[in-house]
Amino acid sequence: MSENTKVEAKRVFIGAGCNRVVNNVSWGASGLVSFGAQNAVAVFCPKTAQILTTLPGHKASVNCTHWLPTSKFAFKAKKLDRQYLLSGDSDGIIILWELSTLNNDWRHVLQLPLSHKKGVTCITAYMVSETDAMFASASSDGVVNVWDVSFPSQPSEECKVVCLDSICVDTKAIVTLSLAELPQNPGRFALALGGLDNKIKLYSGERTGKFTSVCELKGHTDWIRSLDFSLPLHTTEEIPNSIMLVSSSQDKVIRIWKLVLVGDVGSWRREITLASYIEGPVFVSGTFTYQISVESVLIGHEDWVYSVEWQPPVIDFIDGRLVNHQPLSILSASMDKTMMIWRPEKKTGVWVNVVCVGELSHCALGFYGGHWSPNSLSILAHGYGGAFHLWRNVSSSKESENWQMQKVPSGHFAAVTDVTWARTGEYLLSVSQDQTTRVFSAWKNDEGNEAEDEHWHELARPQVHGHDINCVAMVQGKGNHRFVSGAEEKVVRVFEAPLSFLKTLNHTCAGGEGSFPEDLQADVQVLGANMSALGLSQKPIYLHSSSEPLERNGGGEGLDTFETVPEAAPAELKEPPIEDQLAFHTLWPESHKLYGHGNELFSLCSDHKGNLVASSCKAQSASMAEIWLWEVGTWKAVGRLQSHSLTVTHLEFSYDDTLLLSVSRDRHFSVFSIQRTDNGEVSHKLMAKVEAHKRIIWACSWNPFGHQFATSSRDKTVKIWSVENDARIKQILVLPPFGSSVTAVAWTGLDRNEKSGCVAVGMESGLIELSNVKIIETEEGTTATAALALRLEPFMCHVSAVNRLAWRPTEKCESNQSLRWLTSCGDDNCVRVFNFKF
């Protein structure tokens, strides 16, 4: 196949949630935020609430990320045109990445040698200068490695990373670290370690030597979850002589420790008395003596405190000098669903929480981490549900604070199993093993509504379920927006868009074109949906429902029931919703349940007229591998198609709805003829069953312009087939072998007259390729030619297996016949949207 270089690709959108682990998020001096999304390292811009890229390299789930420099050292990054990012995974691998701030290009610099044998739990760093840094990494096997890194001063140079020391603490895991330079002792550092033994271990060492244990700090009564050193504290003295360490624990308590320079070793030993040790441990580093003592104990959180972080330094005048001043301000994040900002009172010096923000949703399950922005005007939290929460201080006065929630990127926090477009492309719908169904759409910006001004956001969360969701299909045809979903259960569930969603859709880029007019909206009597605490069904909230009296459940006293769950408040949204709204107020009501399958659902599809839905389930026998046909509207079973002996992995109707194609784990595909009689009954007939591949067939797709289709398989091949006039199935083309198992395929039409189209191929490696395919029909039969159109760059593709590809319906491309939109989903928790110019 020759390569056609005329196809231009643009990545439009990435939706992903954060891995549910502590230390996973880092806010860099560049203003960008990094986090782990399965085995990808994702980077997003808080200003636009858009994920900019994902970095491929890790094979295991990413546990932690850390910028060099972070927001704490933003004052040392003003002149840097390159910044760096560290990421560690559950296999113990640490990778160093480079960002060119001039053109926003990313580069894989190196994978650290001698990485950990078990999962990396934490990475911390200290910027010695603009071109030098130290960092430490901890592992669940109790080993802490200390590294020295030198950044290149010239573009032609490379980073130099040296392992200074490897500290074997004990068999218990170390889960948090913090690194700081000792006051008035250049080149000597303090390293604080926290883990599962409730103690803070303090080590001291040089950039060129080993680190030795100097003392232990006791006080916490449960696991230490977070540690953070402050920068040197400026006082009336010219040179600061103290730093602070803040620690948090599962005992719900935050402790502040003060590390003070006592003096040089000789003078201190002359003055040593028993009283010298009352305030706290004393240790020697080099020629200086230090003492560390408890400064304050902060009690306010009601659950485990997972994260504490000092506010980044601010430029301030102290004694007529312009210095980077360390504010006495701490941000804490807890599993009690709150973040707090702690500061000492000016008069008494007593530490109090001056700001408290958090989640009010009953669906919320607490925060794993909290982070300051470089300018300290924003704070970011990430939680158990993989979601981000961003607050910004919008107050114009320095005397008061007004923290308001801001837009953030969102997405699934587990593998995304299926994705589909709305019937005319207004939005896309994805389902995941995180047990949610999500709607993504482009929102209009203030600048305009052209493609360049579109920002994609999560529009709604129609289904929040109790089982992993495997498949989804939009019901095509006229009428309200409807979809069917199948999960790790035997029931197909049908959902219908409520009025609140239809009105919200008018504010999106695509929905404003009147895809569901006002006069049709008047027929929709359901405003939204409620979710019961102990059930899986989502009950409708009617537009004019009468509220029942509170006494229906004994005044609300007694045992908890489904009636104690707060009522959802669905409403028209004029801007992208925040997490609290998405989690509970954007549900779609469930209208029907379809019973029949004997095992968990695996695949669904709808015909293009909106008359039929086909479904399949997991199967190890021919009786279980039946394909069920359901009539839209009555939702009755109108057919049970038998052909396969193992799980049917994918289903698709031809574009004229006369044929149904199925592919299976049994390495066969089947083509069924679907006909409607004059009285509306559905008849079906097996036309052909062909053993098409040597391994499991994962996906199939029809040519929009004819009865040709593509199949993709674990045998790394994609084959093109044609249904001939005499009902024979003929293989007309085999694309050259791919680099890994082909898990997804999708065909879009480009030119009906020339019968040309484009086949998108998604692989287990995460890569995506496009091939131009042209169908040639003659009297002798059908043939086809193909040419490689484009191989997407790895930085644009998924980092794990691609599970589904879907082209946007071509009705949305009529204004620009050369533009096509493709969405994809994968095991890296990501939903992606691309556009291609042919």
Swiss-Prot record:
Localization in the cell: Cytoplasm; Nucleus
Any Pfam family the entry gives: WD40
Keywords: Abscisic acid signaling pathway, Cytoplasm, Nucleus, Plant defense, Repeat, tRNA processing, WD repeat
Effect of loss of the gene: Narrow leaves and reduced root growth that results from a decreased cell division rate. Increased abscisic acid (ABA) sensitivity and drought tolerance. Higher resistance to oxidative stress mediated by methyl viologen (MV) that blocks electron transport during photosynthesis and by CsCl in light. Accumulates anthocyanins. Reduced defense gene induction kinetics and salicylic acid (SA) accumulation mediated by pathogens (e.g. Pseudomonas syringae pv. maculicola) accompanied by an enhanced susceptibility in npr1 deficient plants.
InterPro entries, A to Z: Elp2, G-protein_beta_WD-40_rep, WD40/YVTN_repeat-like_dom_sf, WD40_repeat_dom_sf, WD40_rpt
One of the GO BP terms on file: defense response
Keyword Cytoplasm: yes
Superkingdom in the source lineage: Eukaryota
Biochemical pathway: tRNA modification; 5-methoxycarbonylmethyl-2-thiouridine-tRNA biosynthesis
Tissues where this protein is expressed: Expressed in leaves, stems, roots, flowers, siliques and guard cells.
Cysteine-cysteine disulfides: none
Ranges of the WD repeats in the UniProt entry: 17-56, 57-107, 115-157, 174-213, 219-267, 300-352, 361-401, 411-450, 464-505, 596-640, 643-682, 692-731, 737-781, 797-835
Gene Ontology CC terms, in alphabetical order: cytoplasm; elongator holoenzyme complex; nucleus
Subunit structure: Component of the elongator complex which consists of ELP1/ELO2, ELP2, ELP3/ELO3, ELP4/ELO1, ELP5, and ELP6.
Domain notes: Folds into a two seven-bladed beta-propeller structure which is required for elongator complex assembly.
Role description: Component of the elongator complex which is required for multiple tRNA modifications, including mcm5U (5-methoxycarbonylmethyl uridine), mcm5s2U (5-methoxycarbonylmethyl-2-thiouridine), and ncm5U (5-carbamoylmethyl uridine). The elongator complex catalyzes formation of carboxymethyluridine in the wobble base at position 34 in tRNAs. Promotes organ development by modulating cell division rate. Prevents abscisic acid (ABA) signaling leading to stomatal closure and seedling growth inhibition. Involved in oxidative stress signaling. Prevents anthocyanin accumulation.
PANTHER family, alphabetized: ELONGATOR COMPLEX PROTEIN 2
UniProt record similarity statement: Belongs to the WD repeat ELP2 family.
Protein name: Elongator complex protein 2
Native organism taxonomy: Eukaryota, Viridiplantae, Streptophyta, Embryophyta, Tracheophyta
Annotated gene: ELP2
